[in-house]
Amino acid sequence: SVAALMTPQLIARRLKDSGDADKVIVPGLCLGDIAPLADQYGVPVERGPADLKDLPQYFGQVGLAPDLSDYRVKIFAEIVDAPMLSVAGIVAKAQAYKAQGANVIDLGCLPGVPFAHLKDAVQALKALGFAVSVDSLSVDDLLTAGHAGADYLLSLTEKTLWVAHEVAATPVLIPAKPHSLPSLYRAIEACQKAGKPFIADAILDPIHFGLTQSIVRYQALRKKYPDIAIMMGIGNLTELTDADTTGINTLLFGIISELNINAVLATSVSPHAVNAIAEADLARRVMHAAKADDRLPRGYSNGLLGLHDRRPFTYSVDEIKEIAS
């Protein structure tokens, strides 16, 4: 880091000549005009890469490929229209989400829409080896799902927590009232007292409807309970913002990494969010690797760069004319 702070003037003062070297390479973060250095030393002077780990590529070597095989965040991929699909249709969508990186398939129930084949859907997915969660406002649906073998139930409050004691499924806890952390804390402490495993979700709100405050709530939740499992539903940002989901997922997973959040509930409904689950999979791996290396999340993958390349190759005017012709 000290070398990166050197200026051309400092280098000129400290390094009187280049000795036997036929080229001088200064740090990539060295700012200023380096042409006078070439005049002083009589050899070419170049600016190297900004990041130490880019040196192999700078010298023409392939370098070590980042290891993105590990991650810590589970992805729950929600099938939001599950009641409207056949069991075969649910299985097909589950297989597609699994291929994109989903760890758990979430069956989203619709208010007022019967889900007569809920039990069959859960059992079909379990028979194929899927981990399954069911998301419903109806305690009847949640009980049916739990008895059918669902692994997780979304979402229970302190008022409906009794459901969790009727089945083996792990409950995902949310506030009984919007934004009410005390009610979430009470549900958490009830599960802890009963020895019941759980996941807590403080609820991420959309932009202009409480986003910033909801992030603060997640921070407060993690500070109060350093060791519990926490989930964040990211669809309120990826689905409800007209912006490329690559950047949204990247930023969210940076926050998720800093807060040690253990799971996300992701959706892929809007046309612009068609790859949101696959992007979430890559983002969790990049952030995990960068955190393990104690580095900024740069140089691990280009897969989250949708509009610009990290090292763009620009064509000259003549080359563009030649291509156009």
Residue ranges of each PLM-predicted region?
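Catalytic beta/alpha-barrel core
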Residues: 45-50, 105-111, 129-138, 149-163, ...
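Short, well-ordered coil/turn segments that N-cap beta-strands
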Residues: 22, 43, 71-75, 102-103, ...
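Active-site-adjacent beta->alpha loops and helix N-cap segments on the catalytic face
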Residues: 6, 29-37, 56-57, 111-123, ...
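Active-site mouth loops of central-metabolism enzymes
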Residues: 71-92, 176-180, 237-246
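Alpha-helix-loop-beta-strand connector modules within alpha/beta enzyme cores
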Residues: 42, 73-75, 112-144, 166-172, ...
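Metallocofactor- and cofactor-centric catalytic cores in central/energy metabolism, strongly enriched
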Residues: 1-32, 45, 132
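Short, acidic/polar
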Residues: 85-97, 138, 142, 184, ...
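Catalytic alpha/beta core domains of metabolic enzymes, predominantly
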Residues: 166-308
